[in-house]
């Protein structure tokens, strides 16, 4: 019974932390965005891609799961991302995906898909302002690394 209470308390804390994302949280830095998704994504066993949609003042409108992949890849097409961003009237977006290995170093595939998503964003007028790769308690920001 005590173990169940502890698990429930931990889950409640996790949900309250993620609720912050839905209550007009402002993204000022890559670490702000990472903070929103880190606890939920760091232990996933499969690659998952999330989309953080922002308004003109970089306030979070919504966070949406876009795709769930395998152990080492997440298949995503730019249209899947921008359909959601357009529906939400996003001014800009941040994409985040995890590496189940715990190592957030971007792969060549990560860099290629980021370029495609960025190009699509220019066409539809919704800026991709960052791509975060989430590892175990750490992350890599494409913006900070000059890859965007």
Named regions from a protein language model:
Residues 9-13, 102:
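The DNA-recognition helices of helix-turn-helix-type DNA-binding domains
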Residues 13-37:
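Long, charged amphipathic helices and adjacent flexible linkers at domain junctions
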Residues 67, 71-148:
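Active-site-proximal loop/helix of nucleotide/amide-processing enzymes and allied scaffolds
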